[in-house]
Amino acid sequence: MNYLVMISFALLLVIGVESVRDGYFVEPDNCLVYCMPSPEICDRGCKRYGATSGFCKEFSKGENFCWCKGLR
């Protein structure tokens, strides 16, 4: 059991615990941001909030919203 704890701790040190999130970004009133009229809106908006990139993703039938990769 001691070895399991030591190995787990060593993995955390090697891998690191810093992580990023993916998800939809919202306007200040908590509304999802539509991709239309231009998908470039997503990339610019996501990068403004610290993401690595953004693109259109289908949320539900026929509705596309901005999806951000690597949000901090």
Curated annotation (Swiss-Prot):
Cell location: Secreted
Keyword Repeat attached: no
Signal peptide range in chain numbering: 1-19
Molecular-function GO terms, alphabetical: sodium channel inhibitor activity; toxin activity
GO biological process terms on file: defense response
InterPro entries: LCN-type_CS_alpha_beta_dom (IPR044062), Scorpion_toxin-like (IPR003614), Scorpion_toxin-like_sf (IPR036574), Scorpion_toxinL/defensin (IPR002061)
Maturation-removed propeptide residues: 72
Entry GO CC: extracellular region
Tissues in which the UniProt entry reports expression: Expressed by the venom gland.
Disulfide partners: 35-56, 42-66, 46-68
UniProt remark on domains: Has the structural arrangement of an alpha-helix connected to antiparallel beta-sheets by disulfide bonds (CS-alpha/beta).
Protein name: Probable neurotoxin pcD-996
Species the sequence originates in: Androctonus australis
